[in-house]
Structures are given as structure tokens and as C-alpha cells.
Regions:
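GNAT-family acyltransferases
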Residues: 1-47, 63-64, 68-71, 75, ...
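Conserved active-site alpha-helix within GNAT-family acetyltransferase domains
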Residues: 55, 79-95
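Conserved acetyl-CoA pyrophosphate-binding loop and the N-cap/start of the following alpha-helix
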Residues: 48, 52-61
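Residues that form or flank phosphate/diphosphate-binding pockets in enzymes
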Residues: 39, 52, 82
Length: 108
């Protein structure tokens, strides 16, 4: 998998395309959430769901947060139980609500 930085929509990209073996499989979200945290997330094509990509991307994004010495936040749409499951699986804990989403913060 590879981040395609050139696909960014601003000077400091917020959304990156993701590919595997040359095929587009979705996007990752990676941007400042506040001064101390980055928001991470993913939007994957339905035909790649259940193959572990979300977990792989989550690990990669957590590593990027650590390089920046920042925490990680995942905002979960309450209708997406899988997102909540992945957040909890990787050590995120519920920390509140924002704009109708459940907010999970990585506990280190």
C-alpha cells in the first residue's frame, strides 16, 4: 500500500488516495484535529471490506501521529459499528461526541 501525497487537495493534504498493487481501494483522512491530536480515518471501497485494510491503515496512521508527537482521534459515525470496533481494537477509548459522531482518542 502507498499513500499518494500528490492526490492531496491542499498545501497540507487532508485526504490521501490509497492503492494496493496499483489499484485504487479508497482514501485515508489525516489532518490536525486540534493542537495536540491528528484525526485519522479511512473510506474504503466496499469490495475490500473485511480484508484487514482498515487495521493496517490505522496502524500506519498511528505511527505517523507518533512521528509528529501527536495523539490520534477517530470520529465514528454511530451507524458504522465496524469503525468503532477497529478504534477499540487499536487502543482508542470513547472520549465524547462531536457533530453527531462518537469521538475516540488513542490511549497510550
Amino acid at each position: 500500500m502507498q499513500f499518494l501525497v500528490d492526490a492531496g487537495l491542499s498545501e497540507k493534504p487532508l485526504v490521501y488516495a490509497v492503492e494496493d498493487s496499483g489499484s485504487f481501494i479508497g482514501y485515508v483522512i489525516f489532518h490536525d484535529y486540534d493542537e495536540e491530536n491528528m484525526e485519522i480515518g479511512w473510506i474504503l471501497k466496499r469490495d475490500v471490506w473485511g480484508r484487514g485494510y482498515a487495521s493496517i491503515l490505522t496502524k500506519m496512521l498511528i505511527a505517523e501521529c507518533r512521528k509528529l508527537r501527536k495523539g490520534a482521534i477517530i470520529e465514528c459515525d454511530p451507524r458504522q459499528a465496524v469503525t468503532e470496533h477497529i478504534a477499540k481494537k487499536h487502543g482508542f477509548k470513547f472520549s465524547g461526541k462531536r457533530d453527531g459522531c462518537d469521538v475516540y482518542k488513542l490511549e497510550e
